[in-house]
Swiss-Prot record:
Protein name: ATP-dependent protease subunit HslV
Record-listed E.C. numbers: 3.4.25.2
Cross-referenced HAMAP family: HslV
Domain of life assignment: Bacteria
Record-listed Na(+) binding positions: 163, 166, 169
């Protein structure tokens, strides 16, 4: 099973725009197995964007479940994430899944953790993966000192900085936005 724990995914809400991006590197242990993986997915006809880190098969299982919850709860992202987290914590099969998700829409950024937690950041930035602290630090600085940048530009530059520092993050980026 392909595990993409060593990756970087970031979402930024800034100036009425939301962007999410990820690098394209997949590793198994200390070996790069692919350099152009797309870790960003669109749900609800692009109204919800998601990014994942962890085991690929596990992430797709969770994305499918999250999509089902979004359909069931009429696109209410936070409610859908909480219901997914409840399932994640109580379902014996789901508890063994090794993945983390970021979900964004026009109003919200959410981190859905591997322990079934749903976290809404208060600074408009959420990151996961091995390069997440580098990307988050860059995004915090850019939001503070370059407020004229768009959310997409902040995501791009933050991922580029993370790729320069983290050996498990490359600069083959996928970025999507919601305005």
């Amino acid at each position: 099973m392909l595990k993409i724990k060593s990756t970087t995914v970031i979402a930024v809400m800034h100036n009425n725009e939301v962007a999410i991006g990820a690098d394209g590197q997949a590793t198994m242990g200390s070996t790069v197995v692919k350099g152009n993986v797309n870790k960003i997915r669109k749900l609800l006809d692009g109204k919800v964007l998601t990014g994942f880190a962890g085991s690929t098969a596990d992430a797709f299982t969770l994305l499918d479940r999250f999509d089902e919850k979004l359909q069931r709860y009429f696109g209410h992202m936070k409610r859908s994430a909480i219901e997914l987290a409840k399932d994640w914590r109580t379902d014996r099969y789901l508890r063994r899944l090794e993945a983390m998700l970021i979900a964004v829409n026009k109003e919200e950024l959410l981190l859905i953790s591997g322990t079934g937690d749903v976290i809404e950041p208060d600074n408009g930035i959420v990151t996961i993966g091995s390069g997440s602290l580098y990307a988050e630090s860059a995004a915090i600085a850019l939001k503070k000192h370059a407020p004229h940048l768009t959310a997409e530009e902040i995501v791009r530059e933050s991922l580029t900085i993370a790729a320069d520092i983290c050996i498990y993050t490359n600069d083959n980026l996928t970025i999507e936005k919601i305005s």
